[in-house]
Amino acid sequence: MENEMSQNGSDRDPWSKPGQSNDQQPGNSSNNNGWNNNQNRGNQEQSPPDIEEIFNNLLKKLGGGNKKSGQNNGSSQGNTPFHFGKVIPLAVAIGAIIWGVNGFYTIKEAERGVVLRFGELHSIVQPGLNWKPTFVDKVLPVNVEQVKELRTQGAMLTQDENMVKVEMTVQYRVQDPAKYLFSVTNADDSLNQATDSALRYVIGHMSMNDILTTGRSVVRENTWKALNEIIKSYDMGLEVIDVNFQSARPPEEVKDAFDDAIKAQEDEQRFIREAEAYAREKEPIARGDAQRILEEATAYKDRIVLDAKGEVERLQRLLPEFKAAPDLLRERLYIQTMEKVMANTPKVMLDGNNGNNLTVLPLEQIMGKKSVTSAPSAVNSSPAFTAPERQNSYQPQPTTVAPIRQGRFN
C-alpha cells in the first residue's frame, strides 16, 4: 500500500519544489522522473504570474533593492527591502518639473490677464509669455480691443401718452479688465439694463411726433448722455463708443396716418431744398446785374461830372470874349443853343414877304414825317388837323412852301 502511494506521488511535500519528492535521495534515479517533469512543466504554464516578483523587479530598476549572493532567485526576491529614501526625492523632483512647466501661459495681443492669487485680485499682466504658480494663481484673460454690441428694443410710453416701438444698439468695449470682472456681477447685463433705462427716460420726455420725425438725433444724443451718467456710478470698466437709434414705429392702428404726416414733412423739406437751390442759382446772376448797374451808374456819374467840368472850362474861356463883345457872344450862344434844340425837330420855312393872308401848312406831311423819324413808343396817334373846305367858289392861289431844312441857320 505504501509502495503504491509512493508511486502515485501522494506522499510528496506540498511545500517542496515542483517535481521533487521527500524520499528522493541525491544521486538516486526514479523510474517516474520523466512523468514528473512533464507534470511540473504543465503546472508552471497554468499558474498565474507572481505579483510580488514583478513588484520587486520594478524596485530593483528604481534602485530600491539589492540582490543577496548565495541565495536562489525566489528567496532573494521575497526578502528584498523597500528603500523610500531614494524614491521620494526622485518623485519630488519630477513633480517640481511638471509643476513649473505647467505654469507657463500666453496672453494674446488684444487681451489683458487678470491674476487671482488664492481667489483674490493680485495684478494685471500684459500680452506675451508669462508664468504663474500652479494651484496658487488663476489667470482670467479679458479682451480689451474687441468692440461689442448690444441691442435693446421694446414698446415705450411717450410724453403725450402714446405707445411707440423703438430699437437701439450700443457699441462698447472693456476699458478696465479688473472692474469689468469684479465691480458688478455681470457687466454686460448691467449695461443692457442701463441702456433700456436711459432709453425709456428719454422717450418718456418727448412727444411721439418728434420721435418719429425730426427728433431722432435728439433721442440718440440724450440717450448716450444719460447712459454715460448711469454707468459712471457703477464703475464697470466699460467705455461706450457709439449709440445708434435704429428705428421708431407707431402702433399699427395709427401707422397709416403717421406715414402720411411723415411723407408731407419730407415733401416740405424737398420743396425747401429746391427753393434753396433755385436761390443759389439766381443769386449770382442778380449780384452780377447789380454790379453791372452800379458800374454803369458810376460811369454815368463820371461822364456827367466830366461834361460839367468841360462846360465850365469852356465858359471860363469865353468869359474874356464876352466881356470884350457881349452882344456878339450873346448871339453866338443863342445860335448854338438853337442848333441843339432844333437839330432833330421838323421845321417849316415861310416867306414873310408874301402878301397872302391865308397860309396852308401841310400838316399831314409834317406829322407823317415826324412819325417815321420818331421812336415807336412816342405818342403820335392823334389825327392830323384838316382845314375845313370852303363852300364858296373862292379858289386860293397855290402857296409856295420852302423846302424843309435841318441844320445851322445861315
UniProtKB/Swiss-Prot annotation:
Pfam families: Band_7. Signal peptide: none annotated. Keywords: Membrane, Transmembrane, Transmembrane helix. It comes from the Bacteria. GO terms for cellular component: membrane. It is a single-pass membrane protein. The keyword Transport does not apply. The keyword Transmembrane applies. The chain crosses the membrane at residues 87-107. Its main location: membrane. HflC and HflK could encode or regulate a protease. Belongs to the band 7/mec-2 family. HflK subfamily. This is Protein HflK.
